Amino acid sequence: MFKSGSGSLKRSGSISSVKSFSGDSEKGLPPISRGSVSIASQNSEPLIVPASSSSFAATSDFVPEKTKSEGNLKNKSSVITGNFGSSGPTNAHYNQNANGDRLAENLLLKESSKGRGSSTPDARHTATDSRLSQEVKQPFSEENASGNDLNTGRGSHGTGDGVEQYYKFDCEEGMSAYHKRVVDTFFKYFEYPAEDGHSTLYSDVMFLSGGGDLGLLVMSRYQEVMTLRLRSAIYGIFCYLQALTAYLTYFSAKVGQAVMLDEELEKYEIRLDVAQDDDPIVFQITTGVFTSGVAHDLRKLTQILETFSLER
């Protein structure tokens, strides 16, 4: 269980429209739709890298929303925004075997073809790219072939130890084989030694959740993986964004923000605001202290966000 950091998942009202993400003949995922992601800085300075290194636009017209006074909040903030709304009706006959594999493959190939910022791909990365691109092509088992209803009727799981037990044993059942493969593939893809000799400290995050269907989507089965595989605080963001963007399309995610809380400590807060009808949901994560490699790590983050948005 996580021991440091903080995070929260809040929701008002209820969400009753989510039934399954398994894509069987009666219940299914909506089609993946295209979106856009941009990076802006209040003080007109690009948050990450020159335009030549990324297709993200650096702008200065962002007016940060009012925030609570917490920590050492500076007068500088940056924001990452994206429109991940679904562009079409739900496809009740979504073909995971074909479309799911193709999406995962495209994400991997696009990311590997773009390179890794200022770093140079080595033999280990090349071998990893090849191995993983083959891995996502492997045939799916018959697991979840009949679909999984997220409304399992297992009752309230509350908070504290009950949450940990619930997520560890039940959430895996609410995920399709396709979702497991895509997330696992990205975990493996980013599992490589930190570059430039910077520290690989990862700040754990404690989730406070009201439970229900949304809880399944956020935590899934990767609680223990996050502390074992992710090599730095920024990779924690990779984990949450990858898992969430795969599911938040269903809820028509409107905006994601990365707000600098402390300039000297390079402390950020990541928020994803989602709206399903009139039922707003806020996912908030405080990463803690970044290391001296924050510029390199944030450059990686832009590449991943770009990949997600372009494939929607």
From Swiss-Prot:
Residues 1-37, 62-97, 112-159 are annotated as: Disordered. Residues 63-73, 122-134 have a biased composition (Basic and acidic residues). It comes from the Viruses. The keyword Lyase does not apply. Residues 74-97, 135-154 have a biased composition (Polar residues). It is found in: Host cytoplasm. Residues 1-23 have a biased composition (Low complexity). GO terms for cellular component: host cell cytoplasm. Keywords: Host cytoplasm. Constituent of viral factories. Belongs to the phytoreovirus non-structural protein Pns12A family. This is Non-structural protein 12A.
